[in-house]
Amino acid sequence: MNNIHTPVMATEMLSYLAPVDNETYLDCTFGTGGYSKLILSNCNCKIIAFDRDPAVISIASQFYQQYSNRFTFFNDNFVEANKYLSKSAKLNGIVMDLGVSSMQLDAANRGFSFRYDAELDMRMSQKGYKASELVNEASEHQLADIIYKFGEENKANKIAKHIVLAREKKPITTTLQLANIIREAVGYNNYYKKNKIDSATKTFQAIRIFINDELSAIQNFLNQSLELLAVNGRLIVVSFHALEDAIVKKFMHQNAVKKVAQSKYSTNKQLPLQNGVLHLLTKKIAVPTRTEIINNPRSRSARLRAALKINE
């Protein structure tokens, strides 16, 4: 299993998940198997893993060979978990490592990154609507809305206008072609000085999120997760940008047990609790250590939230 990447915030994930023998855990985003490998190596437990990317099937096959009946894999989006999992068999923990994987970013032919000149694809499942189809067919208004909503890009209108003008001359089919159109629209040097990122970064993020319907999948799965988890089961989510983290934060806080304020004259030392399902294990977000960021710069934007299900 030489192709397994070191997963982000591995120590923190294991600490909050606290896996033990004879329990079952769900890895929503298998990727190259980093989290699954850590959990399976930590104790004699079982893993059920999901990933919609067919490129990871060969890696999952290696896990079947090594872990036999301790490992089960489904080549599908984690939002479809309910279709595969028995309602009577509750999970003891769920881990989610959101966003695009290092494997996908590093595969030039997948079209996720403008570090390579490749076909503008960006599909995690390698099925359906390509990014090139979006940028060549969507209206200027639609493009601006997508770039602003999913990329939080303040210059969305300007970028959308330049994309439409460029495609009138020649179809936009490659990553570098699109990146250069964006850079021409908003500049590069001044944008980098102000934002510390390439001027194409936010637009590429926006298109990827839209193409793969990432945010609604996160929201829909989180809504399912309370039914899937057993009491004392743990939910661990690692996100990489504010849009993902906002969904996770809102979900956990909305479903958290809260203490009810009472009079300072009350003799009841233990505060009564409002209805809720989750106990927050992370009162604030957990972030990577400085050492991890130095060793793995891609971890710098990672944010981890964890919660414990304490009742049905």
From Swiss-Prot:
An annotated Gene Ontology molecular function: rRNA (cytosine-N4-)-methyltransferase activity
Cellular compartments annotated: Cytoplasm
Reaction(s) this enzyme catalyzes, per UniProt: cytidine(1402) in 16S rRNA + S-adenosyl-L-methionine = N(4)-methylcytidine(1402) in 16S rRNA + S-adenosyl-L-homocysteine + H(+)
InterPro entries referenced in this protein's UniProt entry, alphabetically: RsmH (IPR002903), SAM-dep_MeTrfase_MraW_recog (IPR023397), SAM-dependent_MTases_sf (IPR029063)
The enzyme's E.C. designation: 2.1.1.199
Entry-linked SUPFAM superfamilies: Putative methyltransferase TM0872, insert domain, S-adenosyl-L-methionine-dependent methyltransferases
Pfam families: Methyltransf_5 (PF01795)
Binding residues for S-adenosyl-L-methionine: G33, G34, Y35, D51, F78, D97, Q104
GO cellular component term, pick one: cytoplasm
Enzyme class name: transferase
Matching Gene3D superfamilies: Putative methyltransferase TM0872, insert domain, Vaccinia Virus protein VP39
Keyword Protease appears in the UniProt entry: no
Keywords attached to this entry: Cytoplasm, Methyltransferase, rRNA processing, S-adenosyl-L-methionine, Transferase
Source organism, top-level taxon: Bacteria
GO terms for biological process, alphabetical: rRNA base methylation
Known function: Specifically methylates the N4 position of cytidine in position 1402 (C1402) of 16S rRNA.
PANTHER family to which the protein is assigned, alphabetical: 12S RRNA N4-METHYLCYTIDINE METHYLTRANSFERASE (PTHR11265:SF0), S-ADENOSYL-METHYLTRANSFERASE MRAW (PTHR11265)
Family from the record: Belongs to the methyltransferase superfamily. RsmH family.
Protein name from the UniProt record: Ribosomal RNA small subunit methyltransferase H
